[in-house]
Every structure is written in structure tokens, then in C-alpha cells.
Amino acid sequence: MLGPLRKEHPIFRILNSTFVDLPLPSNLSIWWNFGSLLGLCLITQILTGLFLAMHYTADISLAFSSASHICRDVNYGWLLRNVHANGASLFFICMYCHIGRGLYYGGSNKIETWNVGVILFLVTVLTAFVGYVLVWGRMSFWAATVIANLVTAVPCVGTTIVQWLWGGFSVDNATLTRFFAFHFLFPFIIAALAIIDLVFLHNSGANNPVGLNSNYDKAPFHIYYTTKDTVGFIALIAALFVLALLFPCALNDPENFIPANPLSHPPHIQPEWYFLFAYAILRSIPNKLGGVIALVAAILVLFLMPLLNTSKNESNSFRPLSQATFWILVATFFVLTWIGSQPVEQPFVLIGQIASLLYFSLFIFGFPLVSSLENKMIFS
């Protein structure tokens, strides 16, 4: 007698084991929704980006005009652009929440899954950066010039890499063309990495809020967690359309509505809001090479989390000192984001330097030392 098609068909069997019969801990909270929300954001970005690419022209004399043409002349082009631009912001909000949940509940202990996730985050950052340049507004142009020029700080090969990246000695037509190619390609790499991340996650099993072994109490993904994820989908789509329809420019830089001009730069050059924390860390180091190293380390430090973990408990749920350390890190992240949006002058420079030092100290010394102290308090 044949079983259900979802269990017999070779393709449906894979989907069934991933989205239907997957056994999960029965006590997962709303913080576990962000993985599926990231998947929804990625699909939305790929679909809207595909339609935008049909009307966009990757040429410095036409890029700004083609972006304007999409909003003015293409049917629902304004909606596509607003959803795509604000979808990127929601993508990063979900990603930061997802990373925060991993840090708080011990997801960083699953080394392969965590490392693939950090690589995914890096590729997403690159995708957003090259996409920001495509509008060819004044802030986009100077962000591409200033941020890419930082690579020249790399000894020996830095200048060569920048010239290859720019396609010449300055940001020009070749730069825009290759950035458009990268921006079109990277989302599919992100999708592939997301599948690899899922494979590792299903191999190691999901953690849970209390950090205990959940093999004795599992629930199937469908219908319990599909329903829960659907609630998250509705909330995310509602938030996206509120932004896209009512406040489409709330998270955009006004300088980007001015066409790019190599002879005129904005009074304060800054990236999009979701990169401001790293930009603040970059600015807090007076040396160019040191700033670039700090900028890269701000993300790469996440790779150290599984190696620096000293706790005997997986989750922070029953560890008040680790909870306090985590929320200090979150507060530091918000302070750095605020500092990144401020001009380079006192007292913002000093606050940025203190927050940057605290950011790295919490990752490298704070969490391991606090976890060791809690081990002694609880288990000795």
C-alpha cells in the first residue's frame, strides 16, 4: 500500500522533512519566528528586485533618471521601489533580532549553523551596500567613493583591489555596471547559503528557550509552527506596507534624491541606518588601517562566539548576569547606531570610542568571564 505522496515522492519527501514533519521543541517562542521572516524578506526582495531590474539602466547618465522613471511612468513602479527599499530595512531588523536571539538563547553554540549564518550576514551587508549605490544619488555616489576607498588601507594590494572594484581610478560607469551585476547575483548566493544553513540546523537540531534537551517533548512543524509563522508573516507584511505606503522615505537619506555630482558632496557622508553601528566603529579609530580592521572585526567577532563560550548552560534564561551583559551589548549597539549618524565632532567622537571599546570588550572578555563566574556560583 502506498503512503502519502509527501512521504514517497523524492522531492516532496525533502520538503516534507523540512516544512511538515520536522520535529521541533514544543516551547519555541516568537523569537524563533525571525528565521522564516528572513526567508519571506528574501523572497520579497528577489521578486521586487527582478521587476525593478527590468526597468533600471546601469549607466551613470541614466541611472538616476531610470529610478525616477520607475516611480513616475511604470505601473506600480513606485510601489515596487518603496517595497524594495523598505524591505531591505525590515530584512536587517529581522536579521539583527535573529542574531540577538542566537546570542541570548545559545544558538551560537551550534558552530556550523552559526558560522554559515555569519557568512550569510556578511554577504547580505555587501548586497545592501552595492544596491545602495545603484540609485546614483549624491549620498550613494560619495558612500561608494569613501567606503570603497578604505580598502586602499590594506598593505600592498589595497590600491589594486580598489581600482579593480571601481573599474578605473575613480567611481565611474564601470563601477555602477559591476555593482549592478553584484547586486543581481548576491541574493541568489544568499538563498543558497540559507539552504545550507537549514541543512546544518536540521542536522544539529534547534535549541529552545530553556536550553534543555528537548528530545522528550517535540511537536511537528505543521500545523503548530506554520500557524505561528503565518502570524509573523501577516505582521511583517503589514509593517512593510505601512512603511511603503504611508512613510516611504522615513528610512531613506534625503541627500539621495539629489543626482550624483563628483564636485559636490553632502555635508555629512554616512551609509544606510543599518550600517551605522559599524561606521561608528570605523570612525572611532583615528588611523585608516586601524579603522578598516575594526570595521571588519565588528562583524567577524561573531565567529568567535562559539569558541569563547564558557557557560555550562546553553541558554541565558536562568543566568541573570549574562542577561545583563547581553542587554548592555544591545544598548551599546543602539548607541553606536546613533553616533554613526552624528557629525565627526566632540562629544560624539569620544562617545563612539567608548562604545566601540565596550562593544569588543563584551564579546571578547565580557561574555566568557561572566559565564565562568556564573558556573562557579551555580555549579560549585
UniProtKB/Swiss-Prot annotation:
One of its GO terms (biological process) is mitochondrial electron transport, ubiquinol to cytochrome c. InterPro entries: Cyt_b/b6_C, Cyt_b/b6_C_sf, Cyt_b/b6_N, Cytb/b6-like_sf, Cytochrome_b, Cytochrome_b_C_euk/bac, Cytochrome_b_N_euk/bac, Di-haem_cyt_TM. GO terms for cellular component: mitochondrial inner membrane; respiratory chain complex III. The chain crosses the membrane at residues 34-54, 78-99, 114-134, 179-199, 227-247, 289-309, 321-341, 348-369. Binds 2 heme b groups non-covalently. Heme b b562 binds at residues 84, 183. It is a multi-pass membrane protein. Keywords: Electron transport, Heme, Iron, Membrane, Metal-binding, Mitochondrion, Mitochondrion inner membrane, Respiratory chain, Transmembrane, Transmembrane helix, Transport, Ubiquinone. It comes from the Eukaryota. It is found in: Mitochondrion inner membrane. Its cofactor is heme b. The keyword Zinc-finger does not apply. It holds the Pfam family Cytochrom_B_C. A ubiquinone binds at residue 202. Signal peptide: none annotated. Heme b b566 binds at residue 98. The main subunits of complex b-c1 are: cytochrome b, cytochrome c1 and the Rieske protein. Heme 1 (or BL or b562) is low-potential and absorbs at about 562 nm, and heme 2 (or BH or b566) is high-potential and absorbs at about 566 nm. Component of the ubiquinol-cytochrome c reductase complex (complex III or cytochrome b-c1 complex) that is part of the mitochondrial respiratory chain. The b-c1 complex mediates electron transfer from ubiquinol to cytochrome c. Contributes to the generation of a proton gradient across the mitochondrial membrane that is then used for ATP synthesis. This is Cytochrome b.
